[in-house]
Regions:
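Short amphipathic alpha-helices in soluble, non-transmembrane regions
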Residues: 18-23, 54-64
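N-terminal first-folded block
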Residues: 2-29
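Ordered hydrophobic segments in well-structured contexts
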Residues: 4-8, 43-45, 70-73
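Amphipathic, hydrophobic secondary-structure cores in small proteins
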Residues: 12, 27-55
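Short connector loops at helix/strand junctions that flank enzyme active sites
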Residues: 2, 39-41, 66
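C-terminal structural segments of small proteins and small subunits
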Residues: 57-92
Length: 92
């Protein structure tokens, strides 16, 4: 089972600035998975154990509006390849 949180962005600039902002939370920048559609094609992957600290940093320091990004919870079954992807409320 592979579980993670994902931020997708409307612009490459927003993706790169968020990745730099969340660097202390050990996030990973990656292409947006095929099962999600996002404009710029870049996403930031957050491990479940780093979710709370990532959200706190993002909430306190990000200048993005809720129109600039989308937030997802992803669970992928490695054996079957099945993916469960739920869009979450924006980080507030």
């Amino acid at each position: 089972m592979d579980e993670y949180y994902l931020l997708t962005f409307e612009s490459t600039h927003a993706a790169i600035s968020t990745e730099k902002l969340l660097k202390p939370a050990e996030v990973t920048i990656m292409p947006v998975p095929r099962f999600i559609s996002a404009s710029c094609g870049i996403s930031v992957r957050i491990r479940p154990d780093m979710r709370e600290s990532s959200e706190n940093i993002f909430r306190e320091s990000s200048k993005l509006t809720t129109d600039d990004y989308s937030y997802y919870h992803v669970i992928r079954d490695r054996a079957s390849g099945d993916v469960q992807c739920n869009k979450l409320e924006p980080i507030k």
